[in-house]
Structures are given as C-alpha cells and as structure tokens.
Amino acid sequence: MEMTFRWYGHDDQVTLENIRQIPGMKGIVTAIYDVPVGEVWSRERIHQLKQDVEASGLKLSVIESVPVHEDIKLGKPTRDHLIDNYIQTIKNLGAEGVNIVCYNFMPVFDWTRTDLAYVLPDGSNALIFDEEVAKKMDPVKGELSLPGWDSSYTKDEMKAIMDEYSKVDEEKLWEHLEYFIKRVIPAAEEAGVKMAIHPDDPPYSIFGLPRIITCKENLIRFVELYDSPNNGVTVCVGSYASDPNNDAVEMLKEMLKRNRVNFMHARNIRLTGKGKSFEESAHPTEYGSIDMYEVVKALHDANWEGPIRPDHGRMIWGETGRPGYGLFDRALGATYLHGLAEAVAKNAK
C-alpha cells in the first residue's frame, strides 16, 4: 500500500516539508480549494498543484475531493451542465496524470461532529459525535460549522436548500446518484481516472437529510450501478464503524473481493455504547472499536497496493489548528499503519 497524507494547500499550517519527514510517506491527498463548486478545474491549476507537491519529493496521489454540486444531488435541470463541468475536470486531471478522485454524495453537509475539541481522559482533544446533541441541533440557525462544510450559505439559503431536500428521500437520491455515475464513469474510464466514493459520515440520516452510502448492502448496490473498477469506493473504516450495525472489516473484504477499493482511510473510533454516539480515538486497535490489524491484513491478503491515509487525528502535545487535521497524531497514525503493514507481511511468510 502507498502511504499518503491529507494536505490543505499552502494555507495549511502542516507543510509539505513536515509531511515528507514522516517515515514511509509517499504521497499527498489534496484538492484545489478556491475554485467554486461546479466550475472546471483548469489543466494549468492542476499542473501547478502537481508541481508543488512533487517539488517536496512526494507524489500527488489522490484528489480529495472534486465536490459534487447540490443541484446534481437534487436532480435539478441545471445538473447536466454541472456534470459536463465535472467530467471536464476529470478529463483534465487524467491528462495531468492524476488518476484517483475521492468524492462524496452527502446532501448539504460533509462529515459531521457535535464537538471538535472533546477532552479525552489522557488530556488530548478529539472529535466526537453525540447522537442526542445532534438531534437537538438546527443547522439552519448556524449552530455548528465544520471544516468540511460549505460555509458560503446564508441562513435564508440554508433554509431554502433544506426545504428542497425535504422532497428528496433515499430512493430519489439513489436515482440522482445513478444518473451522475452513468455519465461520469464512462468519461473517467476514458481519462484513466478511478473514482472513489466516500461513505456518509456518520453513515445514517442527520438533520432529516437522506444518506445512502452507509452500509454493506448499499455499497454493493452502489458498485452494481455501473460495473467498472473505475466506479470504486473509498473505504473509510472509521466512518462505517461509527454505526454499530456495520462490520467495517467485513465491508472492506467485500469491496476488495469485487476489486472496487480505490482508496483507503484508516482511522479508529470508539463507540460509547450510547446509541450511535462515538469518539474519535488514537489509531491503534486498543484505543477504539476497530481491529486495525485486521484492516491492514485484509489489504495484504488481497494484494492491495493502492493509496491509504491516516484520517482524523487528535490534537496532542499542545498542537492547535484545523480540527482533526493536525500533524502530530496523524503522523503517529501513519507510522502505526506502516508498522502494521510490515508485521502483517512478515507474519504471512
């Protein structure tokens, strides 16, 4: 597997030089963050991004992400033009030698947590999701803002888009996803780009919005929408495991068997036992609810050689910055995963 690390561009306090010094680090996962959603990423901008990354001695491994415009998810008449733009971006990425794109189909909100700096017993700060707190939150009132969210909405715009989604149930969202997939994947095949849909995080409905990339059955349904290795998935074990009904390792094995794992996010979470509430933990198995050794072993047993990255980290050793995306704990996670991979490989001999 190819160890990679999320980088938020030159405004990120975690620099490429920092990342390059992490043992075993090979690639960067990033995006172009200042192009409005729905517009085309030019080859010139992609080329510059690739040059910037490669100048640090790393590879531009994955784009995470090319966001999908809400009009596409809503199935509005404007979607065809927006999908045309999306396809052109995919073609431009392929032409510049960037061949994996992670994206999601979550309505309105990206990953969602209820506390960004919860203090764990060891004194570190972590992201958590409290199901009861989430039930009482009203996103229209702007009660919470997270790094993955589109912060450009006014309150009136947020109310309007939430009203539009009140008419979109899960089956209707499936229809819109299928429409998108059947247009984008043939172009991705021609461009040599593997698409990798990220799970909904957490993988169940929040704020009354439909969510569909949530469980094993829905993953199988998704990959069967279009039978191609280019129509693949990002297996984020931490996202899937945050629903107690999911077996994240079994879901990973199912997608590996189907040759659809195009990207991996490997992080741990600890289910608190209070409904679907969870805490994001340190990466090692003993701190969470996921057997991380079995995750890496499944990848090894399938001879999987794709990109993997440590995901959200705690804030430790006094570090501050973007919640979940500091340097120190993610670097620990990367070296832990690297060590697991070595142990699994040697035990297999």
Model regions: which residues?
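Glycine-rich, proline-tolerant flexible connector loops at the mouths of alpha/beta enzymes
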Residues: 31-47, 109, 207
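Aromatic-lined carbohydrate-binding surfaces of glycoside hydrolases
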Residues: 65-72, 104-113
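Extended, charge-rich helix/loop segments that form flexible
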Residues: 108-176, 191
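Long, hydrophobic/aromatic-enriched structural stretches that serve as scaffold segments
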Residues: 57-68, 89-92
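Histidine-acidic metal/acid-base catalytic patches
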Residues: 1-4, 9-18, 51-54, 71-75, ...
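N-terminal ordered "arm"
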Residues: 13-15, 22-37
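Glycine-rich, positively charged N-terminal anion/phosphate-binding segment
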Residues: 12, 22, 40-61
